[in-house]
């Protein structure tokens, strides 16, 4: 192996078995691709194994030199994907795993252990955000399997809160390694007049006060409560609301918008390719985050990057991201 920056070039793997909105191809600033880019630019050869629903098409994409992402259909139980280890390269020098509370990781760990490949977990949360019976069962399965692996191996925590959560679960050696934005895919050098041009293109007026939200339309993201909040401020100024996302509450959200006659004030974009996401932030005045259990909040970081003021419910992620930042606000409740 040739020398790269004082170290050796290595073949590294990144595994993400989450079958949900995490790392959705082409639509979000992907954490696994951001990590992959950082490693590849150190001279390492990186393969990302990203689990997808079996209904989707398998695809291998060369992101850039030394970085490939392999979208692999996986059997899954909810958001928990099952990685078939036959796809893993036995020549890997290490496998980074976006683990969280994924329950189907023990067999991957055993595969690595047999080949003496270091298994490094990357954790944002170690408990289910749901409180129903199914989630309690999943938490129990996690504790019986994956958590035991975390207790014996290197673990990276995305936030100080994640590190503390892991410590309380008996994982004493987690090291904080914050998630960052993949700057390679962020828009740079935006002209000063672009905001007004984009507003016109998207059907908004120059004097509109545009609020935006980017999230999966699921209960924990609280899109229905976002409409309640919008109704409170509607009419005080020329407020408009942009919501980017889809999910199980999409139909109910659309019905609530119709019921309250907000079709002209609220615009929903179910899917926005990531190369176009900068337009949403650029033409908006404020970004609203309603999730009371936000673990990290990539969209919050993106909004800050594009100089869009953020108002977020105080939670683990926003409390770190927005700490001591002027022009942004952490709120204790919706009324603020």
For each of these PLM feature ranges, what is it?
Residues 13, 156, 199, 205-221, ...:
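Conserved donor-binding/catalytic core segment of Leloir-type glycosyltransferases
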Residues 127-151, 162:
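Nucleotide-sugar donor phosphate/pyrophosphate-binding loop at the beta->alpha transition
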Residues 151-176, 181-188:
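A short, active-site helix/loop in glycosyltransferases that binds the activated sugar's phosphate group
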Residues 254-272:
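Nucleotide-activated donor-binding/catalytic signature segment of Leloir-type glycosyltransferases, i.e.
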Residues 271-272, 279-284:
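Short alpha-helical donor nucleotide-sugar binding micro-motif in glycosyltransferases
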Residues 292:
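Aromatic "clamp/platform" in nucleotide-sugar-dependent glycosyltransferases that forms part
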Residues 309-312:
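Short hydrophobic beta-strand element within catalytic cores of glycosyltransferases
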Residues 324-335:
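Conserved acidic donor-binding segment of nucleotide-sugar-dependent glycosyltransferases
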